[in-house]
Each structure stands twice: as C-alpha cells, then as structure tokens.
Amino acid sequence: MKWLQIHITVDQEQVEFTETLLMSLGAVSVTLDDAEDQALLEPLPGETPLWNKVIVTGIYQQDEQDPIDVDTLEAFLKAQLPDVPMRHEELEDQVWERAWMDYYEPIQIGEKFWIVPEWLEPPEADATNIKLDPGLAFGTGNHASTFLCLQWLGKTDVKDKIVIDYGCGSGILGVAALLLGAKKVYATDIDPQAVLATKQNAELNGVLDRLYVGLPEEFDQEFKPQQADVLVANILAGPLMALAPEFAKLLKSDGDFALAGVIEEQVADVSGVYSEFFDILDVEKREENWCRISGKRKTTN
C-alpha cells in the first residue's frame, strides 16, 4: 500500500481548523512542524506551544484499487483554505510511523556519554551508553539545553546520591544519573507522555528499579519530606523562577543543582531569583544562546 501526504502551511490560528479538516477527510495521522525555524521559548504549563507558521501534514492511505483523486482533494482543501501554500507527495509502502529512525545517529556528549538510539549498537562499548527511543518525548541530546545538563551531570558526583530530574521529558537526565551510580532518581513532568517515556527509557537501560517517575502532584506525595543531594531541571525560565522556593525545599544544604532551558537574555533574571536560596557558581553557554546555570544550595541552620 502507498501513502499520500498533504502538506499545508498555515498561520497559528488556522492550525486547529486545518487538523480537523484533514481528519474529517480521512487522514490516518496529522503532524505539525515549524515552517520558519522559530524557537519556542516560553509555553505555559499544560499548553502545547505552536509556531507562528505551521506545516500541517495529513497522511492518507492510497488504496491501489480505489485511489484518492489528489486533484479533487486539493481543490476541496484550497476552497476551504484559500491562498495558503499546499503540496502533496506519495510515499512507497513503508512503516512510515517510524521512518524518522533513519535520521538518528549516536551522539557523544562530553567525555562520558553516548546517546544511542535503541536500534543501534554503541560506538564505544565501554562508555556510559544511554539507550533511548527518541520518538517518545522531548530530550534526545540534540537540543543544547539537554546537552548542557548531560555535560554537567558527567562532571558532578552523583554516585550513591538521591537525584531529582524535574521536567524529565524522555527521562534522559535521570537515566544518565542512574547509569553514573545514583542511588535513586525521582523524576517528574507535567506531560503524561513524558512519564511513560521516562519509564520505558529507564527500562531500556536496566535502571527502572531505581527510578520513581510521576506527575507533579504524585511526585510531591512520593518524595516529601525527603531532600535530594542533586537536582537538575531542564524546563524554561518562567517555570524555573516560579519553582525556586520549591526547589530550595527539595534540595539539601550544599546540594548541587543545574537549571537549563534558559536563554542568555534570561540568565540575570533567573539567577537573581535563585540567589536568595542558592549560590550561583557557574553559567555555561552553548550555541543558539541556550545557557545552564549551576551551583549549590545555601547552607541552612
């Protein structure tokens, strides 16, 4: 069986209508992609952020016995969505849901880590190899903020320590800490898909027995009144600033922390909020202005 893809570039406010339209016309899947290489810096908790211009792609089964008339389909779509760019392509029979696997390769991060897609062999068997299913949730090592956090973990003593991974995404940071010898990782995310992905990636790496992961309200019940030795949070500046008092309660005196998901222009504001509770020891910058802020919890009496 072949597949037909229809790509439509629309403004943000047209996305929901376009998705619904494609599904009503029999699309088996609809995906959203950035049309202008625009960074998404500050979504609110629980929101799915969108770019200003979005490529909405509908995928249709193209039955050889009763094929879709592409000209008729496009004419109808153009009548509903006039003056928007639109194109189509046909795909040969394949497992298109996982076709993206061909584009992933192992990534080396610092001196300790390799991020290895689960279907590939590690380039260095003796390295700390993190097996990952990149299709499950955000956090593959490709993004600068994830890279910065992994780099920091590789230099931080986590052996036999309690670690919090706040905003865990794919679970890559928590898994990395466990592979480095952490006693226990407590991970949390507002996205149920991220909770599932973290469990699955921990299982891939044989560390599920030392991991707890849940939504924030579940995490609060499970973790408190403990305190962690290490806390890493790869989210965004707004949520990070709001969570500073909470992180101060979660981390032991003199405990290590790292924050990422912050761009250079936001470093001063985030550091200013955290300086009440934490000593800022280092700010590391990577390409595209993404930064990591790290330091220690101030000693409390």
UniProtKB/Swiss-Prot annotation:
Alphabetical list of InterPro entries matching this protein: Ribosomal_L11_MeTrfase_PrmA, Ribosomal_PrmA_MeTrfase, SAM-dependent_MTases_sf
Catalyzed reaction equations: L-lysyl-[protein] + 3 S-adenosyl-L-methionine = N(6),N(6),N(6)-trimethyl-L-lysyl-[protein] + 3 S-adenosyl-L-homocysteine + 3 H(+)
A molecular function (GO) term: protein-lysine N-methyltransferase activity
EC id: 2.1.1.-
Keyword ATP-binding included in the entry's annotation: no
GO biological process: methylation
Record: residues binding S-adenosyl-L-methionine: T146, G167, D189, N234
Function in brief: Methylates ribosomal protein L11.
Family classification: Belongs to the methyltransferase superfamily. PrmA family.
Official protein name in the record: Ribosomal protein L11 methyltransferase
Organism of this sequence: Acinetobacter baumannii (strain ATCC 17978 / DSM 105126 / CIP 53.77 / LMG 1025 / NCDC KC755 / 5377)
Biological classification of the source: Bacteria, Pseudomonadati, Pseudomonadota, Gammaproteobacteria, Moraxellales
Recorded name of the encoding gene: prmA
